[in-house]
C-alpha cells in the first residue's frame, strides 16, 4: 500500500520529474475491488504503521505455538542466558535498554537517533575482549551440546564486522574447524559484502549459488558443517531440522525475533527441543514475542 516518490525518466534515461508509485497490494485492490482477500502468515504484525489485521481484517483462524507443540508439529523452545559469561559494560546494557525502548516507540523504524545508538552499541558489543569471551564460550557450550545431541547451530551477530571477527577468533581457538573450501569446514559466515567493506569482511562474501550450496550442507545432518554465523541471512524461511541451538548477540524483538527462533523448533528424530542462547539480555523481548504469538501466554 505504501506510496513512494521515484524519478520519472524519458526514453533517454534523463530525469524529467517525479512520480508517485504504490505497492502491489493497492493495485490488486484497485483491479479487483469486490474480491475477498485472505492473508496467510506465521508472524502477523500489529504495530501502528504496519498492522496485518488492519489490512486483511480479523483473524479467521489461529494455529499458535502451543498448539503446534502439543500436536508434535514443532518442538519446545528453551531459553538460556549466558550474559554472566561475557562482559557487557553498564553503558552497553543501558544502550540495549534505550535502543529497545526507541524501537518500541518508533515501531521498529530506524531514525537517526536510533542508528546512532546502534552504532555505539555495535562498538561495545564488538570489542576485542568481548568477542574473545563469546568465541570461547560458544565453542565450549556448543561442544557440550553436541555431546548430548549431534546437530547444528547458528550464531546471530549485530554487524558484518563482528561476524567476521568472531569467525577469526573461533578458528584461532579451533583451527581444524576452518577451511577455505566452500564444501569443507565446520563453521562458515553467511553474508554478502561490498568492495568498500575491506578484505576481512569481503572474503566472506557469498553469491546466491554459493549460499544455496552452504544451505544444502547445513540441511544435511551428515555434513561436517555444524555452525554458521549470520547477521540477517537465513533468519527467515531457512529450515534445517537438525539445528538445535541459536546464539543471539544482536538486539531483536517482535516478529523478527519470532522468525529467528523458529530456526530451531523443527522436529528432527528425538530432538528434545530448540535452545535460544542469549548474550545480550533479550529475555523480556523473547517473552513478549512468545506471548503475542501464543494463546498460552508464551509458556
Protein language model regions, located:
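SF2 helicase catalytic motif II
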Residues: 1-39
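Conserved C-terminal RecA-like helicase domain
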Residues: 117-230
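Short regulatory helix/loop adjacent to the ATP-binding pocket of P-loop NTPases
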Residues: 46-58, 268-272, 291
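A short beta-strand element within the Helicase C-terminal
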Residues: 226-230, 234-259, 274-278
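Conserved segment of the helicase C-terminal RecA-like domain
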Residues: 80, 224, 257-296
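Short glycine-/polar-rich loops that comprise or flank the Walker A/P-loop
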Residues: 32-36, 60, 71-77, 150-151, ...
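Conserved nucleotide-binding/hydrolysis micro-motifs of P-loop NTPases
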Residues: 1-2, 42-47, 83-87, 160-162, ...
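Interdomain helical connector at the RecA1-RecA2 junction of SF1/SF2 helicase-like NTPases
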Residues: 49-150, 167-171
